């Protein structure tokens, strides 16, 4: 009817006015972030999407890896950031785009550092430690690494959320691990010290999408910046 046509014309007119004023509709970008990824890493990976000339409206969802992959397969997300690749066994058509890798650093508050005995990594033996939850890819590597070096720290707490683990670490409750690419930021932000590093412990980061060839402008910006900046150090 006439009413629908008038409304449609009104919409078109509003759209053309918006475009003429340079107020084009922002690009929607829906991203899922696995809760095992450090918040600072997630920020550095996602930030380039907001630095594009085009206006972007980003929606971030944090959750467990399998739940996010399910959302991706239903096209409810454009991208999933994770520290593990999606497996073919899952039966979901998704593609892994490697962003980079980082070794791990061991950090603690200066007050705790003063109490540690011996050089790294021997100083970890019997020392209070905060670790990632059992489902984390880094946790499995860490358990193996500690066994290999015959080290038995005193486990004070296990955390799915790295930000919460860092908060306890900052207060001197235990030694904690963090990706080495964040050392400068973590030490400055939390007032903690690096007591040692390991390149045997590696955290990998992936952008997972339903596209084999990346076409979403935000995903293109993220993958480019990760390789050129964050993981180029």
Regions found by a protein language model. Give the residues of each.
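Central regulatory/effector-binding core of bacterial HTH transcription factors
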Residues: 26-88
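Short beta-strand->loop
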Residues: 94-105, 180, 188-202
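Alpha-helical "hinge/linker" immediately C-terminal to small N-terminal DNA-binding modules
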Residues: 1-22
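Flexible hinge/capping segments at coil-to-helix
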Residues: 93-134
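Short, well-ordered beta-strand segments
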Residues: 28-32, 80, 130, 176, ...
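Hydrophobic hinge/microswitch elements
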Residues: 64-68, 73-76, 83, 135-193
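A late-sequence structural motif
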Residues: 41, 114-115, 193-233
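Secondary-structure junction motif
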Residues: 83, 114-117, 127-149, 215-223, ...
């Amino acid at each position: 009817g006439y009413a629908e046509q008038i409304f449609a014309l009104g919409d078109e007119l509003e759209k053309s006015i918006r475009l003429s004023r340079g107020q084009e509709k922002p690009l929607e970008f829906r991203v899922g972030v696995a809760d095992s990824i450090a918040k600072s890493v997630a920020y550095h990976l996602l930030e380039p999407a907001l630095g594009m000339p085009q206006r972007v409206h980003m929606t971030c969802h944090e959750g467990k890896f399998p739940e996010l992959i399910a959302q991706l397969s239903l096209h409810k997300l454009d991208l999933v950031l994770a520290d593990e690749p999606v497996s073919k066994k899952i039966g979901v058509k998704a593609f892994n785009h490697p962003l980079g890798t980082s070794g791990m650093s061991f950090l603690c508050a200066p007050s705790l550092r003063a109490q540690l005995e011996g050089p790294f990594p021997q100083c970890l033996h019997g020392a209070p430690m905060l670790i990632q939850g059992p489902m984390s890819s880094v946790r499995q590597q860490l358990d193996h690494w500690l066994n290999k070096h015959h080290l038995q720290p005193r486990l004070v707490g296990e955390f799915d959320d790295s930000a919460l683990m860092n908060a306890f670490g900052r207060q001197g409750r235990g030694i904690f691990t963090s990706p080495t690419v964040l050392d400068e930021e973590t030490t400055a932000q939390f007032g903690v010290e690096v007591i040692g590093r390991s390149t045997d412990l590696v955290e990998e980061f992936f952008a997972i999408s339903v596209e084999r060839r990346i076409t979403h402008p935000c995903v293109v910006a993220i993958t480019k910046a990760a390789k050129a900046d964050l993981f180029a150090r």
